[in-house]
Each structure stands twice: as structure tokens, then as C-alpha cells.
Amino acid sequence: LLLLCTGCDNSPWNNPYPNQDSAKNIYYDSFSERPKHLDPVSSYSSNEYVFLGQIYEPPLQYHFFKRPYELIPLTATGLPKAEYFDKNGEVLEEDANPENIDRVKYKISIKPDILYQPHPAFAKNASGKYLYHDLNEKKLNNIHSLSDFDTVGTRKLLAKDYVYQIKRMVHPTVHSPIAGLMAKYILGLNEFGEELSKLEKDKSGSNYIDLNSVELPGARV
């Protein structure tokens, strides 16, 4: 009996990954369903949140090890500070009877000096004007990926960025599966959505709604 073995090594014969990457610090994972949305406002699948969790940082997160679960700050400087009000708008004590509480206001402060990942959208010229905010088909002729842009930039994360995302939940052209639920807890969210729908109907030739032009009582800076 003669057996001829060639190319024997310590790796599995059906390893789908390149051999030159075997010693690198790379984590491979799989998902059962292709992600449909990487927009946190529209996303509703755990398969999508595998990616979203590596892209976006919320103000709070759960402690990785503690059980029962415990919230800890992530981009926030600390846990939210709650202020309680009765139905007349009067401030209540911290130990007030829950039956007397009509609404709660949470104050969240965001850590300073958190920067966005460098991206062409933030790139500016010497005079401070954005380089790529007026792109047309001709300017995009030789652009196939983000790395094809010559310049990138960044900026600080601001509290108003989170407020903007909350507003997007009821944008007339964006579907958010949790908008109805959140409207029960965020003051004025339904009315805000109705106002955006009016702006959507009234706009002429533009597909852009300035969310900063409309105030949302339940989320302010």
C-alpha cells in the first residue's frame, strides 16, 4: 500500500481563509441572514446589530460581565440625571410617589473630544468649506469607494447628533420599526412627525428636510 501525501500542514484542508492570514489577529464570524439596514433608525435585526455595534456608539451600554445587567456610560459622562414632574409641571422630589409622576426629564452629558472616524463627508478646504457636499454624476465618475476620495476629515461628536437621530425616527421617508413605541415615551414625537409630513408635502423640488428647523420638545440640547 503506497500513500502519497502532498502539501501537508497543520491547517484544515477545507479552511476557507487565506493561509497568510492565519497568524494575524482577525476574528471571523457568520450571520444567518443578510443585513438589510445599517441605519440604526431602520434596523431591527440582531444580524444587523452585529455590525452596528462596531460602528455607532450610544450614550450608555450594559456592563459586559455584571448580572443582573447594569447600565454604564459609554459616550456619556455619567448616568442620566432624572428630574420628575407632576401633571401641573411642578418639580417633584427624587423619592416622589410614582403615582404622582406625570413625566420625567433626563439630562445626559456627552464626553468631549470624541471624534468621528475620518471620512470624505467631513473634508474641508482651507477656507472651511466642505469639499464633497455638492457632488454630481460627473464628479463621481472615477469614484468607486471611499478610498478614492483624496481628502478626509473629522469632527467632534456633539449632543445634537443624538437629538438629530431621534428626530429621524419619524422622518416621512425613513421607516423606523420602533417609532410608534418611542412616541409613547418621547414628548411631542408624534406631533413632530406630523410637522415633518407637512414639510414633506410643501417642499418644492427638494428632497431634503432640515430637521434642525423644527423643535422636538422631548429631545433638546
Residue ranges and their predicted role:
Residues 29-98:
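N-terminal lobe/hinge region of extracytoplasmic solute-binding protein
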Residues 4-7:
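C-terminal motif of bacterial Sec signal peptides marking the signal peptidase cleavage site
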